């Protein structure tokens, strides 16, 4: 379960860089119709094209970026019994979920963790940490793998991309409308074209709106963790899934060696209260355990 910080940062970076580039090329001035008013239809189309482009880029590079940043060693041919068991277990679970077997890898981290990523359910990657393989019982590892297979089978990355595309579109569109209104107010002489203030306002507003809108993406991320827990319980065993989450809770103080860009993709604990809870990609482990015990979320 490990996906979103890198994803959100990539999207935000694409939006800002694209905004600067298009402003330099004069696209914003064209959309402003020489100062006579914004063409909202053209602006909305423009926003959707570039909003979904950023989301698509993030989706397409998610697997190679995850491999690189987490130093994942993919297993093509098993070199020992543990690797053979890992491949066989992922194959069994993916067959049960009705998807093509993902690539399987191990990454060097003391903390028990795992993640799944990829641009579609039949071209995914499932990776586990050395710590997970060392300290978890086989039944618990299997439950964690089932959780990750659940993410893949549920198409979480594609759904996340669609949500992010809509959010990006809103950010690009709203930032330009705000920029145009403020720029028009500041330049009451009625001169044609856009002033320098417009470009500054657009960039700053995109960053602010982008951060605020990320709470929507994170809310979906928290919801999909509950669904993946249910998938783990169905593909493996509910008691083993609960046991795995309880062990993760017990290891909360183990140093996290996973790259910051991938922390949101892992089986990490969420924040329960305060402003940080809005930006947490995962629900608190206590809530996830309770949901499984009460058989909520399916």
From Swiss-Prot:
Q: Which family does it belong to?
A: Belongs to the peptidase M48B family.
| Presence of the UniProt keyword Protein biosynthesis in the record | no
Q: Which UniProt keywords apply?
A: Cell inner membrane, Cell membrane, Hydrolase, Membrane, Metal-binding, Metalloprotease, Protease, Stress response, Transmembrane, Transmembrane helix, Zinc
Q: Which domain of life is it from?
A: Bacteria
Query: Record keywords: Cytoplasm included?
Result: no
* Alphabetical list of InterPro entries matching this protein: HtpX_protease, Pept_M48_protease_HtpX, Peptidase_M48
The GO terms describing molecular function are: metalloendopeptidase activity; zinc ion binding
Q: Name one GO biological process term.
A: proteolysis
> Which organism's genome codes for this protein?
Alcanivorax borkumensis (strain ATCC 700651 / DSM 11573 / NCIMB 13689 / SK2)
Membrane spanning residue stretches: 4-24, 41-61, 162-182, 193-213
EC number(s) on file: 3.4.24.-
Which CDD domains did the record assign? M48B_HtpX_like
Query: So which cofactors does this thing need?
Result: Zn(2+)
**Textual note on the cofactor:** Binds 1 zinc ion per subunit.
Q: Which residues bind Zn(2+)?
A: 147, 151, 225
Q: Know the name of this protein? A: Protease HtpX
Topology of the protein relative to the lipid bilayer: Multi-pass membrane protein
Subcellular location per UniProt equals: Cell inner membrane
Where in the sequence is the active site? 148
Gene Ontology CC annotations of this record:
plasma membrane
Q: Name one Pfam family in it.
A: Peptidase_M48
């Amino acid at each position: 379960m490990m996906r979103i910080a890198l994803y959100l940062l990539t999207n935000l970076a694409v939006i800002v860089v694209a905004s600067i580039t298009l402003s330099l090329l004069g696209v914003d001035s064209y959309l402003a119709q020489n100062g006579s008013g914004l063409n909202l239809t053209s602006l909305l189309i423009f926003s959707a094209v570039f909003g979904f482009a950023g989301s698509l880029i993030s989706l397409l590079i998610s697997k190679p970026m995850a491999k690189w940043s987490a130093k994942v060693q993919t297993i093509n041919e098993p070199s020992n019994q543990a690797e053979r068991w890992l491949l066989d277990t992922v194959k069994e679970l993916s067959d049960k979920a009705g998807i093509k077997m993902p690539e399987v890898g191990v990454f060097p981290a003391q903390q028990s963790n795992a993640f799944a990523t990829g641009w579609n359910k039949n071209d995914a990657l499932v990776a586990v940490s050395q710590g997970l393989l060392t300290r978890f019982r086989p039944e618990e590892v299997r439950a964690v793998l089932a959780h990750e297979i659940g993410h893949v089978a549920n198409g979480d990355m594609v759904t996340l991309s669609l949500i992010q595309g809509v959010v990006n579109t809103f950010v690009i569109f709203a930032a330009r409308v705000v920029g145009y209104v403020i720029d028009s107010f500041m330049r009451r002489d009625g001169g044609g074209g856009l002033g320098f203030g417009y470009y500054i306002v657009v960039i700053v507003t995109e960053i602010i709106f982008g951060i605020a809108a990320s709470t929507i993406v994170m809310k979906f991320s928290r919801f999909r963790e509950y669904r993946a827990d249910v998938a783990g319980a169905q593909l493996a065993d509910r008691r083993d899934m609960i046991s795995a989450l309880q062990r993760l809770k017990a290891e909360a103080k183990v140093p996290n060696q996973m790259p910051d860009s991938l922390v949101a993709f892992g089986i990490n604990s969420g924040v329960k209260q305060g402003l940080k809870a809005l930006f947490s990609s995962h629900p608190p482990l206590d809530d996830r355990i309770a949901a499984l015990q009460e058989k909520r979320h399916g």
